[in-house]
Amino acid sequence: MIGITTARTAATPGRRMALAALFCAAATAASSMPARAAPVVAPDALVRQISTEVIDTVKADKEIQAGNIERIIALVDAKVMPHVNFQRMTAIAVGRPWRSATPDQRARLQAEFKTLLVRTYSGALTQVRDQTVQLRPMRARAEDEEVVVRTEVRGRGDPIQLDYRLEKTPAGWKIYDVNVLGVWLADTSFKSQFAPVITNSGIDGLIANLADLNRKAARN
């Protein structure tokens, strides 16, 4: 059984706020949107845009502040998911077994993983008040296909490190992992939790495990 260890370890008010409000949560259904002809937004500008839009929406929406899960999911789907390569994020978290998963298994994994992220961190959105996001200088070349955008979330208390891995796609820059206080969620946290479940029960066992966690979270 997955214990969502890192989710809970990172669930102090500041940490939960950072992850829920500025990413998922998450991050996270397949998230790639159809490519549209539009100017390519620089990766650091994209992160600033997403962060600002999410924080402003939460501050203006009393139902989200009260923990309305439907409104939170709608916010994530509207403001975050179009800018996330969630298939890649899920593949990273699952690791090598992703390669042998069937299309149906992959779709179910992505759906359950997204629900897990959103439900795990949704309560933190109620804590968004006066936080701001400061981008740190980005080291990247114009030809780079992957970059890391480093930010700090500032409010009451110490600044919170929140970094993003992005890849350049025909549809623009997409986020595929998030680092909260030094821990990459997909590549470190969830991968370490998923691995023993897959070893013992396979991909279907992981899907069932995630579904069970989501059912329990929905009842709370």
What are these regions (language model features)?
Residues 1-13:
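N-terminal secretory signal peptides that target proteins for export/translocation
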Residues 13-19, 23:
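N-terminal export leaders
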Residues 31-39:
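Sec/Tat signal peptide C-region and signal peptidase I cleavage site
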Residues 40-121:
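Early exported N-terminus immediately downstream of N-terminal targeting peptides
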Residues 49-52, 67, 75, 81-84, ...:
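Extracytoplasmic
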Residues 118-160, 210-220:
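Surface-exposed, charged secondary-structure patches
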Residues 159-189:
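Short beta-strand edge/turn micro-motifs at domain boundaries
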Residues 179-220:
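Low-complexity, intrinsically disordered terminal/linker segments enriched in charged
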